[in-house]
């Protein structure tokens, strides 16, 4: 995947995460702040940071619950070396339902 393709997929994914949280967080318990390639989610558990790392072609997640992760885009999913999926971690920790493959 070239840099342009990576940027488009990563930016679409990060925007999708922000959108899904805003749609499903009916109590407005998560403060969503999307600034460029960086998404901050301020929750009662702490602050999550999700950002695009262009040089590594990864999305990085910093979770106040489970720590840091680096995800690569392979076979239509953002997964880390241990096989964990970005959307699965966010679903579990934020109680927001995400599709595996955002459009």
Curated annotation (Swiss-Prot):
GO terms for molecular function: 2 iron, 2 sulfur cluster binding; ferric iron binding; ferrous iron binding; ferroxidase activity; iron chaperone activity. The keyword Mitochondrion does not apply. It holds the Pfam family Frataxin_Cyay. The keyword Metal-binding applies. This is Iron-sulfur cluster assembly protein CyaY. It comes from Rickettsia peacockii (strain Rustic). One of its GO terms (cellular component) is cytoplasm. Keywords: Iron, Metal-binding. The gene is cyaY.
């Amino acid at each position: 995947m070239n840099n342009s393709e990576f940027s488009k997929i990563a930016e679409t994914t990060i925007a999708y995460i922000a959108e899904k949280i805003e749609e499903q967080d009916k109590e407005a318990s998560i403060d969503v702040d999307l600034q460029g390639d960086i998404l901050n989610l301020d929750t009662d558990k702490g602050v999550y940071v999700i950002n695009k790392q262009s040089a590594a072609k990864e999305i990085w997640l910093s979770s106040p619950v489970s720590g840091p992760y680096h995800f690569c885009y392979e076979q239509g999913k953002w997964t880390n070396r241990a096989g964990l999926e970005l959307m699965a971690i966010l679903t579990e920790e934020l109680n927001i339902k995400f599709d595996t493959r955002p459009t």
